[in-house]
A protein has these predicted regions:
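Acidic, contiguous N-terminal accessory segments
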Residues: 1-36, 253-262, 271, 406, ...
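Hydrophobic faces of well-ordered beta-strands that scaffold small-molecule active sites
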Residues: 41-45, 72-74, 148-152, 221-223, ...
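Active-site neighborhood of glycoside hydrolase catalytic domains
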Residues: 178, 183-272, 279-280, 285-286
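Flexible, acidic glycine-rich loops studded with aromatic residues
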Residues: 266-273, 279-442
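Conserved small/polar residues in nucleotide/adenosyl-binding loops
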Residues: 464-466
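Extracellular carbohydrate-recognition regions
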Residues: 436-459
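Feature activates predominantly on carbohydrate-active enzymes
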Residues: 2-184, 195, 201-218, 357-360
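Active-site beta-loop-alpha junctions enriched in small/polar residues
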Residues: 48, 77-81, 153-157, 226-228, ...
């Protein structure tokens, strides 16, 4: 007989995950007492640059829950990061550069909205999550005891906003020797502060408020705020105002920590704000704690993956340095970037996570699939899960770990494998039973023209069935 006792529903749920994992081997008699060291065990996915389909998100959540991860941050808008590549060798004027990049650089906003600019530009990208899909994702996350955190990134990384409102493009001086075209992804906080703030809030209102709001039901909202190269004082004012806006809705604000790189006199209230510590140059973790913030260790080294297909492992590489993360990282440990090792018992250190950034799009497109992205998430997730749970009985090094015999969570199928019993064959005489595009029946068989596809009840079909 197996008896499960827990103080909360989440505790009982995690006990069942343990039993499922033990079921991969032989169950033994005994008593298990299990609890996490940190309350936040997270993953950040960039679906703003590279759209990750709904079914892949479901597989990610199922596997997070299986490994007792409980926070999924979805980076829902962003743009090609190396914007100046678009104008190299073109010898354009400064205004010509801005116009060219605004028109041609790839950007994404992945939430269904009806926001359209006076110029006819839609805020929402062609590839996006519908309102129903987002509500299903939020509902599933709650069932799996995962905190689903949508991120809408402004005032930088905001090309999708500027395309709709080009009049709100930043016109002021740029810091950090940034190229002129960086402005197309920056909102104007100098000359049009009130207009910019009102526009951004109006978008958030559509996302969060009302029966048809696609993100209704979330408890934490990430407002972005990283890598803005305009005025520090106006930036600080904007961060403060957006934090207060989210708090006034009864929600928990989360941001990318950046005040160390943006010093100034303008106060920013960080009490109760969750701060992603991603770069020690942008944000000192001790300074964030001193301001009352709850910090999350998602330091770029060793937790960032920037998929490129090279199979490399390391800082900003195809795979994050998951071995270094396991061996030398914990939510309270920032020494991988020569930062401090803080007391793990500090209540303002709520946990840590890892991230997959899809920077390689547009002129750097790699052709990687959503399953390729899943693999990079999954490889680091095992290190994140163990180091944020924090058991003192875990293997001391990555090499000493015992690999699970069943890699993926029950009910998940990230590889989209098909049982032999479910296989079928499409023949010229049966093609009419499927929704076919640019596929023609000929005397020699089936002829596939450019952009051809076949769709059946199981979705898109591959050539293995033909």
């Amino acid at each position: 007989m197996i008896t499960v006792e827990a103080a909360t529903n989440a505790g009982a749920f995690y006990a069942t995950r343990t039993l499922l994992q033990l079921g991969e081997n032989n169950l033994q008699n005994g008593e298990i007492r299990d609890f996490p060291s940190f309350s936040h065990r997270g993953f950040m996915l960039d679906t703003g640059r590279k759209f990750i389909p709904y079914d892949t998100l479901v597989d990610i959540m199922l596997n997070m829950a299986y490994y007792k991860m409980n926070d999924l941050q979805l980076h829902l808008n962003d743009n090609y990061i190396v914007l100046n590549k678009h104008v190299e060798g073109k010898h354009l004027s400064q205004q010509g550069e801005l116009d060219y990049v605004l028109k041609n650089a790839k950007t994404g906003f992945r939430v269904e909205t009806d926001v359209v600019g006076d110029n006819g530009e839609k805020l929402t990208s062609k590839e996006h999550y519908t309102k129903d899909e987002l509500q299903q994702i939020i509902s599933l996350a709650k069932d799996l005891h995962i905190n689903l955190v949508p991120e809408i990134d402004t005032p930088g990384h905001a090309l999708s906003f500027v395309k709709v409102r080009p009049d709100l493009m930043y016109k002021g001086p740029l810091s950090a020797n940034k190229h002129n075209v960086e402005r197309v992804a920056m909102l104007d906080l100098d000359n049009k502060y009130e207009e910019t703030l009102a526009f951004v809030k109006s978008v958030y209102d559509k996302l969060l408020v009302g029966e048809n709001a696609p993100l209704r039901g979330v408890s934490t909202v990430h407002i972005g705020t990283d890598e803005y190269y305009g005025s520090p004082e106006n930036y600080r004012r904007y961060v403060h105002d957006m934090i207060q806006y989210i708090k006034d809705k009864g929600l928990t604000p989360r941001i990318w920590g950046s005040l160390t790189a943006k010093p100034g006199k303008t106060p920013v209230d960080w009490n109760g704000v969750e701060v992603d510590i991603w770069s020690l140059g942008w944000q000192n973790p001790q300074a964030a704690i001193a301001k009352g913030a709850k910090i999350i260790n998602i330091l770029d080294v060793p937790t960032y993956s920037v998929p490129n297909g090279s199979n490399s492992q390391g800082p900003y590489s195809d795979y994050a340095n998951y071995e270094l993360q396991y061996n030398s990282w914990a939510p309270n440990d920032f020494t991988a970037r020569r930062g401090p090792r803080l007391e793990a018992s500090n209540p303002n250190i709520i946990g840590g996570g890892h991230a997959v950034w899809n920077d390689n799009i547009d002129l750097h497109e790699t052709g990687l699939t959503s399953f390729d992205i899943f693999k990079r998430f999954f490889k680091s997730m095992q290190s994140t899960a163990e180091r944020t749970w924090g058991s003192d009985r875990a293997a001391k090094t990555y090499a000493d770990r015992i690999q699970p015999t069943s890699v993926y969570a029950p009910r998940s199928n990230p590889e989209k494998t098909i049982e032999d019993s479910d296989l079928f064959t499409i023949k010229p005489e049966t093609i009419k039973e499927y929704l076919a595009k640019n596929v023609k029946k000929t005397e020699a068989g089936l002829n596939f023209e450019k952009d051809s596809s076949i769709e059946g009840l199981v979705g898109d079909l591959s050539l293995i069935h033909i």
